[in-house]
């Protein structure tokens, strides 16, 4: 495609990776994301978030009133641990970004814990509340989250914060019910402390939802990765969400 004329063209969503575009004209070309590229990650993220939301709601309401003496107590403990870690991991990634170690660790932690929660509920429910099956589901879910985080980093930057927001809100609800119970028993220090923690996790959920929007905006639309762009013209081009990594310039 050397010398090709794309003047004024709409090339959103096009992949020019490794292409020979010497002297090509992209004057006033429009790059970036198509509507499909914007909405598809949102739809996928919404589907995963809804799956987690349903499972989490069932586990949260099932956990209310459980005591350490009951057989389901281990599930309650795992619910608190995984939802709490997923919420704080997603929020740390939203606050510190993917660039730093804290942000990267947070997004992986949130993805693993959110997927573990989902696998824990659905496989455990399929095998009639069997704890061993639920644990196997949690391990499988965590493993899949790691794999997808490595091979699809950009889409997971939308999916994981969406699931992290759900997990954070679920943990907030759990802690809030515990806070009310302590306040009702006149254990004010515990009640106030847990109430404050619940509000912190509401904020974590909001941060995660904001990260979903940022994740969509960072998805690559037009790609020139590895392309030969020697003497290519981009005058007055609207270059948004465009990948020029490893491209050859002048």
Segments from the language model and where they lie:
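Membrane-interface helix-boundary motifs at transmembrane edges
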Residues: 98-105, 155-156
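Interfacial transmembrane-helix boundary/kink motif in multi-pass membrane proteins
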Residues: 108-109
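Hydrophobic cores of alpha-helical transmembrane segments in multi-pass inner/ER membrane proteins
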Residues: 83-91, 139-145, 200-201
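Core alpha-helical transmembrane segments of integral membrane proteins
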Residues: 40-101, 114-117
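Tandem repeat scaffolds
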Residues: 1-58, 67, 114-123, 131, ...
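Structural signature of hydrophobic alpha-helical transmembrane segments
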Residues: 76-82, 131-139
């Amino acid at each position: 495609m050397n010398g090709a004329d794309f003047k004024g063209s709409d090339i959103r969503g096009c992949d020019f990776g490794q292409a020979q575009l010497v002297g090509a004209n992209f004057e006033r070309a429009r790059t970036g994301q198509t509507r499909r590229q914007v909405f598809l990650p949102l739809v996928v993220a919404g589907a995963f978030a809804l799956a987690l939301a349903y499972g989490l709601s069932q586990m949260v309401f099932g956990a209310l009133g459980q005591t350490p003496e009951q057989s389901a107590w281990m599930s309650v403990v795992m619910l608190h641990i995984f939802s709490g870690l997923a919420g704080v991991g997603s929020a740390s990634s939203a606050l510190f970004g993917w660039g730093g170690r804290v942000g990267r660790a947070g997004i992986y932690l949130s993805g693993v814990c959110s997927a573990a929660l989902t696998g824990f509920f659905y496989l455990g429910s399929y095998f009639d509340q069997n704890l061993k099956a639920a644990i196997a589901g949690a391990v499988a879910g965590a493993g899949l989250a790691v794999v997808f985080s490595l091979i699809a980093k950009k889409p997971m930057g939308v999916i994981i914060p969406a699931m992290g927001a759900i997990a954070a809100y679920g943990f907030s609800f759990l802690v809030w019910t515990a806070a009310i119970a302590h306040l009702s028993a006149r254990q004010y220090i515990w009640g106030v402390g847990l109430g404050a923690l619940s509000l912190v996790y509401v904020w974590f959920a909001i941060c995660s939802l904001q990260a979903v929007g940022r994740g969509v905006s960072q998805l690559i639309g037009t790609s020139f990765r590895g392309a030969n762009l020697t003497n290519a013209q981009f005058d007055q081009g609207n270059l948004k969400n465009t990948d020029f990594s490893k491209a050859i310039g002048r």
